UniProtKB/Swiss-Prot annotation:
Keyword set includes Membrane: yes
InterPro entries: CcmE, CcmE-like_sf, NA-bd_OB-fold
Lineage of the species this protein comes from: Bacteria, Pseudomonadati, Pseudomonadota, Gammaproteobacteria, Lysobacterales
Pfam families found in the cross-reference section: CcmE
One term of GO molecular function: heme binding
Protein name (Swiss-Prot/TrEMBL): Cytochrome c-type biogenesis protein CcmE 2
Species this chain originates from: Xanthomonas oryzae pv. oryzae (strain KACC10331 / KXO85)
Binding-site list for heme: H123, Y127
Gene3D superfamilies assigned to the protein according to its UniProt record, in alphabetical order: Nucleic acid-binding proteins
Biological process, per Gene Ontology: cytochrome complex assembly
Stored PANTHER family: CYTOCHROME C-TYPE BIOGENESIS PROTEIN CCME HOMOLOG, MITOCHONDRIAL (PTHR34128:SF2)
Membrane protein topology class: Single-pass type II membrane protein
Region span, Disordered: 135-156
Amino acid sequence: MNPQRRRRLWWVLALLLAGGLATTLVSMALQRNVAYLYTPSEVLRGDAGENSRFRLGGMVEKGSFQRASGALEAHFRVTDGDAQLPVSYDRILPDLFREGQAVVATGRMQSGVFVAEDVLAKHDETYMPKEVADKMGSAHRKHDVPAAANQGGALR
């Protein structure tokens, strides 16, 4: 093998190695930042996995919101119509956060309580995140809730 071919071979191998390393690093970064959406029923069934970071979607259960006066930490329950999951959040809640409204929270389970790092509330009366609407729709079908009750909140 002449020196020019050998040099070209080394360059090709170096580029392949660099490409493989870059692909591996990007893949690892994306895996760490992925947070799948689960309903309270799916979490209680064990679908979310222990110590994994995920998004919890559903409705804030009416009458469940609690916050001590002067404190930032809030406690509430998220429901999908079948199950309720207690949530703890120690930051400022969005202005549109209310009981009976759709919410998507990102965080982890700790001792039976979902500890949220981030909470997103729906932004108007007619919108519900598509993923939450789909998962809530399956709960409605399970309980034979009329289709009209499910159609008002889903984004089309």
